[in-house]
Each structure stands twice: as structure tokens, then as C-alpha cells.
């Protein structure tokens, strides 16, 4: 049986001008001289074709994230960390995207989930003049890139909703360069700004909301955070749904008398995947001839992590969480099981195994891959500050050994010379998770005084700036765009 196949489409011109045409080249040279093609070179270096017909949003974001040199923090293939559209699964299952495509809000969620700063504007929240000014700003810089969501019919093209990055701007012609990620269909092309704006100023039938554009840049902060919401775990959506939808209903349905009862409602029957939902960001390195030293960069990161931990543990909410956890020790529950994983050697054994996998590109399936776990302390300065090294050995498939160190946030020595551990614990995790929940989560608490008390404990406005960043920049976005 014969099947229908297509080889590309003829680019409707006008209104578009093929980038590779003589006129397209002329526009490029002129725009280059105007200084509004600065972002083009980074984008074109990582320009790719979407791997599935409905992956335009994923491929567009993958191009931009790689152009911004954002580290995905996980492997693509072999030992290499690299963004590919098949890896962008933290806000929508890939199988669903493959069939239905992806919406504007979910692409913004994906960008934030993968470490980018996002300024998203639907067409009803902006003007064509604002859009033009932001595009000019992006195209004059290597550090910011614009993604547009538009309906193809507005450009006389076949198809419906589409995402693409913008690669440049020409002032006299008022045209932008669309780097179309469906390269099997249309080549990169220049289009008038006003025409593209009209194509963006349309309704997405899937959501009933306007399309628009977003400006993507790299977060201006070193990767020294303690926690992240592990939205890549298979059960992350059920946990996010429980926290954002079920918890508010549970709080509204019960007569609660104190904060301990509130915490019981939130954590008494969470999905089992909660254990994997919030993750400690550990730092792992190869062992260097048994030499326990820290670079200034390593010291700086560990100091920040220790400061964040200290801010968490001095927060009023932390004291309530600790008290509640103490009351749960005699019970067998998901949260109680979490506490079993709090011991530093057990934590670090898992981490050193994962780290060795990344460092060597060789992982064992099942079994214990780290042995000879050894906890050591190293003085950093004269203020009794020390860091903790947990050293482990990883045996590869060829029976060769690789030593790895897990660097634990700085700790202090107590009055009797004992080190006070500063590694993240269950109480820290739950405190940060509660702070990341939307404020309206608690609005259903019936008792007014209790509701006010809980709200004051979880409000992030009065938190120290380091802890605010930990919650607002790295935790809230995933829950916000669920």
C-alpha cells in the first residue's frame, strides 16, 4: 500500500523572505552592521530540528538553553550533559506532548524548571511596541533570547500553533528572523514584526488563552543551591497535584486546632513519591591522591549552602516541623521512612554512587556500588568552621576503582570539640517544601487565628534573602506552572 509523504513546503513569500535567498542575505548583512544580530551566532551554533512533529516548543527551548550555556545537570548520552528536546519532560509528559503539542505556560514552566530566567508575556499583556523593543534588546545581546508562540496561518503558512526562537532584527524593514525548528518544512525566514505580532495575538484552543512571547536568560546566580524539586521523577505530577490541589481541600474540610494538626493533614498520607520530589543538590568530585583540600570556589559554594541551612533552621516554621517529626517517630509512615535516610553515611553512599556514575560514565544496575565510606572533617579557617568529606570507592564494570568525595556544607565545632553536622535533613526538606507552597494553600483553614499564624510562618517576604532565593527561584516555579 502506498503512503503519502512530503518533502518540505514552499515558503509563502511574501510575506516571508527566505534567509538563504539573495534578499535574505542582504537583510542579514545590514542587520549585522546595525548590531541586532548579536544573539544569532549562539543560537545558530545550537540550532536543531525538532525530533517529533509536535515537539516545536521543546526543540525551541532546547536550542535556547544550549545557547545560554545552561548546564542541565543530567546526562544526555554517555557522560555528556546537554539539552535535547527528548529531555524536557518536567512539566508535561513527553507522550502527551508528542500527541497534543505543548502550551505557552508549559514552555515557560519547562524553561524555569531547567534553570532559566523567564519573562513571559501573552499578547493581551503587552503591545506590539513593547514586543519590538524587547526583541531589539534580545537581538543586541548574546545573553537573552526571544521565543515566540504564534499561529502559522498569520504568516500564510500551513499548520496551526508553533514555537520558534528569534535570531535577529532589521530596523529599517522592521523584520525579525524566525529560526524555524521544523527545518524539514520551512527554512529560517524574515517576517515583518507587525505580521508576527498579529499571528501571536491569537487564541490557543487548548487553553482558551492568548499566545505570546517570552524572553529567556540565564539565572544570575552560581549553582550553589541546596534543594530542587525533582520534576523529572515519574511521580512528580501526582505529588504536585497532591500539594497544590488536594492539600487545600483537606485543610478546608477539617476542624484544625493547632499547627501540629495542620502539618498532620499535609503529611499524613502523601504520595509515596514525595521522597523523591525534593532533592538535595550534592557536590561530588574525583578523589585527588587522597589530598583533602578545597579550592576557593568550592569553599564559596559550601559557605552559601551552610548559610541557607542555617537560615532554614532558625525559621519559626522549622521548629514546628521538627516538633511534628519527633511526634511521628513511633509511627510507620512515609515521613518516618524519610527520616531513616537522614544519616550522613547513608545519604552520601547514594550520592557518591550517583556521582561516580557521572564522572566515569559507567554505572552498575542494582547492588551497592560504593564501599569503604569514610567521613572526615577538614578545618577551613580559624573560626572553627570545617567542611565534611565523605569518601567512597566505586568499582566499575572492569573491576577498576574510582574514588569520589561528597562535599557536605560547612559545620561548626561544639564547645566540647564535636562537629555539629550541617547536612540537609528531613526537617529542612519539609520546611522548604512548605515555604514553596502557594499562599492560597492555607486560606481554607477555618480557625481565623490559626490561619493567620500559619500564614505568618510560611510568608516568604520576611525571610532572609538567601532563603527567599532558594524558595522563590528554584522551588515555586515548578508548583506555579503545574
Curated annotation (Swiss-Prot):
Residue runs in coiled coils: none
Q: In which tissues is it expressed?
A: Expressed in roots, nodules and leaves.
**The keyword Transferase is assigned to this record:** yes
Arranged from A to Z, the UniProt key words for this protein are:
Acyltransferase, Cadmium, Metal-binding, Transferase
Q: Where is the Peptidase C83 domain?
A: 1-221
> Mind telling me which Pfam families this protein's record contains?
Phytochelatin, Phytochelatin_C
Q: Which GO terms describe its biological process?
A: cellular detoxification of cadmium ion; detoxification of copper ion; phytochelatin biosynthetic process
* Reactions catalysed, as given in the entry: [Glu(-Cys)](n)-Gly + glutathione + H(+) = [Glu(-Cys)](n+1)-Gly + glycine
The catalytic residues are 56, 162, 180
Per its Swiss-Prot or TrEMBL record, what regulates the activity? Answer: Requires cadmium for activity.
Q: Which InterPro entries match?
A: Papain-like_cys_pep_sf, PCS-like, PCS_N, PCS_N_sf, Phytochelatin_synthase_C
Q: Which PROSITE patterns match?
A: PCS
Q: What induces it?
A: By cadmium.
Q: Which is one GO molecular function term here?
A: metal ion binding
Q: E.C. number, please?
A: 2.3.2.15
Q: What does this protein do?
A: Involved in the synthesis of phytochelatins (PC) and homophytochelatins (hPC), the heavy-metal-binding peptides of plants.
- Name the protein family: Belongs to the phytochelatin synthase family.
**What's the name of the protein?**
Glutathione gamma-glutamylcysteinyltransferase 2
List the source organism. Answer: Lotus japonicus
The gene it comes from is PCS2
Amino acid at each position: 500500500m502506498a503512503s503519502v509523504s512530503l518533502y518540505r513546503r514552499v515558503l509563502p513569500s511574501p510575506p516571508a523572505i527566505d534567509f538563504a535567498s539573495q534578499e535574505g542575505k542582504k537583510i542579514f548583512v545590514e542587520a549585522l552592521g546595525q548590531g541586532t544580530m548579536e544573539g544569532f551566532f549562539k543560537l545558530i551554533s545550537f540550532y536543531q530540528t525538532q525530533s517529533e512533529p509536535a515537539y516545536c516548543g521543546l526543540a525551541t527551548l532546547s536550542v535556547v538553553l544550549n545557547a545560554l550555556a545552561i548546564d542541565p545537570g543530567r546526562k544526555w548520552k554517555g557522560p555528556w550533559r546537554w539539552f535535547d528536546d527528548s529531555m524536557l519532560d518536567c512539566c508535561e509528559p513527553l507522550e502527551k506532548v508528542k500527541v497534543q503539542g505543548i502550551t505557552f505556560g508549559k514552555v515557560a514552566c519547562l524553561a524555569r524548571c531547567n534553570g532559566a530566567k523567564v519573562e513571559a508575556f501573552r499578547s493581551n499583556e503587552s503591545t506590539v511596541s513593547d514586543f519590538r523593543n524587547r526583541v531589539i534588546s534580545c537581538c543586541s545581546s548574546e545573553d537573552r533570547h526571544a521565543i515566540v508562540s504564534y499561529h502559522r496561518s498569520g504568516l500564510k503558512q500551513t499548520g496551526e500553533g508553533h514555537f520558534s526562537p528569534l535570531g535577529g532584527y532589521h530596523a529599517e524593514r522592521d523584520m525579525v528572523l524566525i529560526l524555524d525548528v521544523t527545518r524539514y518544512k520551512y527554512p529560517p525566514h524574515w517576517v515583518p514584526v507587525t505580521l508576527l505580532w498579529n499571528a501571536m495575538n491569537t487564541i490557543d484552543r487548548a487553553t482558551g488563552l492568548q499566545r505570546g512571547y517570552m524572553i529567556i536568560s540565564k539565572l544570575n546566580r552560581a549553582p550553589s543551591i541546596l534543594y530542587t524539586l525533582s520534576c523529572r521523577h515519574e511521580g512528580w505530577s501526582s505529588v504536585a497535584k497532591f500539594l497544590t490541589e488536594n492539600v487545600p481541600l483537606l485543610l478546608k474540610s477539617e476542624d484544625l486546632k493547632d499547627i501540629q494538626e495542620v502539618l498532620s493533614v499535609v503529611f499524613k498520607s502523601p504520595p509515596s513519591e514525595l521522597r523523591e520530589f525534593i532533592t538535595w543538590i550534592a557536590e561530588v568530585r574525583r578523589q585527588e591522591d587522597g589530598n583533602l583540600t578545597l579550592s576557593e570556589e568550592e569553599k564559596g559554594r559550601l559557605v552559601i549552602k551552610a548559610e541557607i541551612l542555617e537560615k532554614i533552621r532558625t525559621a519559626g516554621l522549622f521548629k514546628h516541623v521538627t516538633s511534628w517529626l519527633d511526634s511521628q517517630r513511633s509511627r510507620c509512615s512515609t515521613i518516618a521512612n524519610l527520616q531513616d535516610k537522614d544519616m550522613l553515611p547513608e545519604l552520601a553512599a547514594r550520592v557518591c554512587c550517583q556521582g561516580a556514575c557521572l564522572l566515569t560514565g559507567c554505572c552498575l544496575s542494582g547492588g551497592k556500588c560504593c564501599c569503604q565510606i569514610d567521613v572526615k572533617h577538614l578545618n577551613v579557617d580559624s573560626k572553627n568552621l570545617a567542611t565534611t568529606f565523605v569518601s567512597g570507592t566505586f568499582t566499575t564494570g572492569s573491576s577498576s576503582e574510582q574514588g569520589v568525595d561528597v562535599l557536605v556544607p560547612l559545620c561548626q565545632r561544639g564547645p566540647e570539640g564535636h562537629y555539629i553536622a550541617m547536612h540537609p535533613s528531613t526537617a529542612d526538606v519539609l520546611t522548604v517544601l512548605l515555604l514553596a507552597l502557594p499562599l492560597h494553600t492555607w486560606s481554607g483553614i477555618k480557625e481565623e487565628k490559626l490561619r493567620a499564624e500559619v500564614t505568618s510562618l510560611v510568608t516568604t517576604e520576611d525571610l532572609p534573602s538567601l532563603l527567599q532565593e532558594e524558595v522563590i527561584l528554584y522551588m515555586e516555579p515548578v508548583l506555579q506552572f503545574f
